[in-house]
A protein has these predicted regions:
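Glycine-rich, phosphate-binding/catalytic loops in enzymes
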Residues: 21-24, 65-69, 102-103, 153, ...
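Short aromatic-enriched loop/helix-cap "lid" or pocket-rim segments at secondary-structure transitions
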Residues: 18, 43-44, 162-164, 181-185
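Hydrophobic/aromatic beta-strand patches that form the interior of the parallel beta-sheet core
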Residues: 5, 30-32, 50, 85, ...
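Cysteine-nucleophile active-site neighborhood
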Residues: 51-122
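C-terminal helical/coil "lid" or tail adjacent to the Rossmann-like core of SAM-dependent
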Residues: 167-168, 172-205
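Short amphipathic alpha-helical segments
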Residues: 18-20, 61-64, 98-99, 147-148, ...
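Pocket-forming structural segment of enzyme catalytic cores
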Residues: 98-180
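N-terminal beta1-alpha1 cap of cysteine-dependent amidohydrolase-like domains
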Residues: 1-82, 194-234
C-alpha cells in the first residue's frame, strides 16, 4: 500500500493522471489544497509526496506564508527516504529544497514540445523513447541539484527531468496531462501565453490533446518504478 499526499497550489493544476494511476491500484490519495488552507501533511501521513505546479515561483517565500514550510517538508521527506515526485513548480521546489538555484529561463515554454532523454542510464527512465512530447507550461527553470542525475532536456530548457536516487523525481514538464487537466490549465492560465517562439496558442494546444494518450503509458511506467509497485502490486 502506498499512501499518497498531493500538494496542490492552484485550483486548475490537479494531480490528473497521477490520481488516475493511484486509483487504479487502490492507493489512498489525499490532496492538500494550499490555495484554500495552508495545511501541510506530517511525514507520518504519507509514503509518497507529490508536489504539483502553479503560477507562483519557488522563490516566493516572503509572499506566500506556506511556501517556506512546504520546501522544508519536501527536504525532510527526501531526507527520510520518502518517495517524492515534483511536477513543474513541484520540480523547482524539489531543486530549491536541495539547494539549487531557481530562476527565470531564457523564454517561456508553453505547449507541446519534445524532450530528449539524456545520455546514460537510469532505472526511472530506461526504456522510455529517446524523445517524447509532453505539455510544458513554465517560465522559470533551475540548476541541477548536487547529486542529482539529469534525465531529460529540451531545446531551450537544460533541466527538464532529474532524479535523486530512485525515489525522488522532478519533472519540469507535465507528463500527467489529461484532456481535462489541459482544458483546466487553459481556462485558468491562458492569459500567461504570449507570442514567443515556444509559446503555443490555445487552439494549437487543444489540437495536441492526443499526446495525453501517448504520455499515459510512460507515466505509468515511471510511477511504477518510482514507487516500486508493479501493475499488479497493491
Amino acid at each position: 500500500m502506498m499512501r499518497i499526499a498531493v500538494l496542490q497550489h492552484v485550483e486548475f493544476e490537479e494531480p490528473a493522471a497521477v490520481a488516475d494511476w493511484a486509483a487504479g491500484r487502490g492507493f489512498p490519495l489525499r490532496v492538500f489544497r494550499l490555495y484554500r488552507e495552508a495545511t501541510l501533511p506530517s511525514l507520518s501521513d504519507f509514503d509518497m509526496l507529490t508536489v504539483m505546479g502553479g503560477p507562483m515561483s519557488a522563490n516566493d517565500e516572503a509572499r506566500l506564508g506556506w511556501l517556506g514550510p512546504e520546501i522544508a517538508l519536501v527536504r525532510e521527506a527526501i531526507a527520510t527516504d520518502k518517495t517524492v515526485l515534483g511536477i513543474c513548480l513541484g520540480a523547482q521546489i524539489i531543486a530549491k529544497a536541495l539547494g539549487a538555484r531557481v530562476y527565470s529561463g531564457s523564454a517561456k515554454e508553453i505547449g507541446w514540445f519534445p524532450v530528449q532523454r539524456t545520455m546514460g542510464s537510469h532505472p526511472l527512465f530506461d526504456g522510455l523513447p529517446d524523445s517524447f512530447t509532453p505539455l510544458h507550461w513554465h517560465g522559470q527553470t533551475f540548476d541541477l541539484p548536487d547529486g542529482a542525475k539529469l534525465l531529460a532536456k529540451s531545446k531551450i530548457t537544460a533541466t527538464q527531468a532529474f532524479a535523486v536516487g530512485q525515489r525522488v523525481l522532478g519533472l519540469q514538464f507535465h507528463m500527467e496531462a489529461t484532456e481535462k487537466s489541459v482544458r483546466a490549465l487553459l481556462k485558468g492560465a491562458a492569459h500567461e501565453i504570449g507570442y514567443g517562439a515556444f509559446e503555443q496558442q490555445p487552439g494549437t494546444i487543444l489540437a495536441g490533446l492526443d499526446q495525453c494518450t501517448n504520455l499515459r503509458p510512460l507515466l505509468d511506467t515511471v510511477l511504477a518504478r518510482l514507487t516500486g509497485f508493479t501493475v499488479r502490486d497493491k
